Curated annotation (Swiss-Prot):
Temperature-activity profile: Optimum temperature is 30 degrees Celsius for the coupled WbpB/WbpE reaction.
Other noteworthy facts: Seems to proceed via a ping-pong reaction mechanism.
Gene name of this polypeptide: wbpB
Function: Plays a role in the biosynthesis of B-band O antigen for serotype O5. Catalyzes the NAD-dependent oxidation of UDP-N-acetylglucosaminuronic acid (UDP-D-GlcNAcA) to UDP-2-acetamido-2-deoxy-3-oxo-D-glucuronic acid (UDP-3-oxo-D-GlcNAcA). Cannot use UDP-GlcNAc or UDP-GalNAc as the nucleotide sugar substrate, and can use only poorly UDP-D-glucuronic acid (UDP-GlcA). Undergoes an NAD(+) recycling mechanism using 2-oxoglutarate as an oxidant.
UniProt-listed GO biological process terms: cell wall organization; lipopolysaccharide biosynthetic process; O antigen biosynthetic process; polysaccharide biosynthetic process; protein tetramerization; UDP-glucuronate biosynthetic process
Name of this chain's protein: UDP-N-acetyl-2-amino-2-deoxy-D-glucuronate oxidase
Length: 316
């Protein structure tokens, strides 16, 4: 049994990490968040210590190191995006391996610095890239490898996850903290595309705002038109008033079944990490580079057949 601490315990994604820790037979012994809305801990690990001040959390973690039976093995990080880097560094320097939510960090330069800290501490950093464990994604990757098509696949990626007025007033709506909508809700999709279709060759942005972004990505084996949004007005008429989220991936005009299979992906990710097969800094580098380019890109009009259909609707 491994001992875990969790940073960002009141966040949206934290319960998935808590359950993954429990479901893999391990123990959450300490948790931290500046907010105290963490009642979920009662149903998962009621014996866990909890702190609302980081200094006390660090002191407790350091004290646990005095006994090998209580010392932390892993620190899981679910804090806001802009705090990932300092929290990862703190976890590694505590002498722990670290598991961090996406996006790992906003820039390749920060990845380089974390690699230095890994070497200094002789500990490992793992990123949650859960779509690599989704059975539909694995099946598509295998199909692409098997077919060895001489032509690039034509892919449309659409992801709309409706958010209310609170969104822009939270850290998620502040691009200095979330790094923008394409990073916050899209980074795992860019990792998925790289995982399936190989190296990125072109990265063009056609539209970006605080609510949505769109562009074109060309990989070794695919041409991808993408559209991401947190605006409910972008939902197709077929789902408006029925579902708050719309997720669609078409490959050569064929809709990929991608509506189920997300429930246990964090647990699968933890199982792989604990078995020594987790995804580290080098695995995350491609998607970090992709979103870093998107954030700084000059917006250009879509060339023929490179613009996502939803972008044309925005211009009307």
């Amino acid at each position: 049994m491994k001992n875990f601490a969790l940073i960002g315990a009141a966040g949206y994604i934290a319960p998935r990490h808590m359950r993954a820790i429990k479901d893999t037979g391990n123990c959450l012994v300490s948790a931290y968040d500046i907010n105290d809305s963490v009642g979920i801990i009662d149903s998962i690990s009621p014996q866990s210590e909890f702190f609302t001040e980081f200094e006390f959390f660090l002191d407790h973690a350091s004290n646990l190191k005095r006994d090998s039976a209580t010392a932390l093995d892993y620190v899981s990080i679910c804090s806001p995006n802009y705090l990932h880097y300092p929290h990862i560094a703190a976890g590694l320097r505590l002498g722990c391996d670290v598991i961090c939510e996406k996006p790992l960090v906003p820039t390749p330069e920060m990845l380089d610095q974390l690699a230095v800290i890994e070497r200094e501490t002789d500990k490992r950093l793992y990123n949650i890239l859960q779509l690599r464990h989704h059975q539909a994604i694995i099946a598509l990757k295998d199909k692409v490898a098997r077919e060895k098509s001489p032509h690039k696949y034509e892919v449309d990626l659409t992801y709309i996850t409706s958010r209310g007025n609170w969104y822009l007033k939270s850290w998620k709506g502040d691009p200095r903290k979330s790094f923008g909508v394409a990073t916050n809700i899209g980074v795992h999709f860019y990792d998925m595309l790289h995982f399936i279709f190989g190296k990125l060759q072109r990265n063009v942005v056609h539209f970006t705002s605080e609510y949505k972004a769109a562009g074109y990505l060309e990989y070794e084996q695919a041409r991808v038109r993408w559209f991401l949004s947190v605006d409910a007005n972008d939902l197709p008429e077929s789902v408006k008033g029925k579902k708050p989220t719309y997720r669609s991936i078409t490959v050569n005009g064929e809709e990929m079944e991608f509506s189920e299979g997300f429930t246990d992906l964090h647990t699968t990710s933890y199982e792989e990490i604990l078995a020594g097969r987790g995804y580290g800094i080098d695995d995350a580098r491609h998607c970090v580079e992709t979103v870093n380019t998107i954030r700084s890109a000059v917006i250009v009009p879509a060339s023929d057949n490179e613009g996502h259909p939803f972008v044309a609707a925005l211009a009307r």
